[in-house]
Amino acid sequence: MEHPLISVVLPIYNVEKYLPVCMKSLLSQTYKNLEIILVDDGSSDGCIGLCNGYAQQDKRVVVYHKQNGGLSDARNYGVEHARGEYIAYVDPDDYVDLDYIEYLYYILKKYNVEMSVCQHRVHFNAGTVDERGKKGDEEVTVSECLKRMLYHDVIDTSAWAKLYHRDLFQTVRYPIGKIYEDTATTYRLMMECDRIAIGYESKYNYIFHENSIINSKFQINKLDLIEATDYMAQNIKKRYPELEEAAVRRQVYARFSILNQMLEVPGYSEIRSE
């Protein structure tokens, strides 16, 4: 099997506490021909020194320091500077299994496709782990992949736990200034493919943080989820009419998700009555 250069993009912003664990998992990958791109998005903690140290330690690490532009801007910056034939994302407060890249590349080449997906574990603060992985892999049509994503079945909208051929990004970028940027983008990358490989083993470790933007309580920018979901549903229904029911269900789910967060805001009932 060939071993082309694979670029792994990490958007870095004030993650000094978590970065060492993440980088240890990447520097120890069984797939060696890597370009590890650290995009320091204007960090104000010790990330600058850590990133520079990793670049001195391992020639595969490339560091870019830029003014803060947000997660989407950092991801786009990484893609635009990547030299690899394939691109993967890892969030710096998570970590990956040692064969994360090897596994994604293996199933991608096995089915000769442009994108592959693996499963992930969720690690909670109490030490519990939500593990849903199993053995096996398969090749599916784009329509089937989108359907499963819309139903939260094996595939989700996250940028990570996926390997992309770089050509998929020719006309696709993450929306700057928005949260839920993955919802607005991952389906577009899928729609650039002919077919997609799905691996059922968990190779990515997502660390649940209650204070993260997505997991925190309701703020007005959480409404970005509805906008992103509606746009996604509109585009999917236009190209794949057979997925209309799944797309509408996802739109309903997005609204209930935001409503539940709003109801948890202290004083919401009083604000609503006014």
Where are these regions (language model features)?
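Nucleotide-sugar donor-binding/catalytic module of glycosyltransferases
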Residues: 1-234, 238
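A structural signal for alpha-helical segments
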Residues: 220, 242-243, 270
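Amphipathic alpha-helical repeat scaffolds of TPR domains
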Residues: 249-261
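Membrane-interface aromatic/basic loop that binds lipid-linked glycans or pyrophosphate carriers
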Residues: 265-274
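Short, charged, amphipathic alpha-helical segments
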Residues: 244-250, 272-273
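Secondary-structure edge/capping motif, primarily at the C-terminal ends of alpha-helices
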Residues: 236-240, 262-266
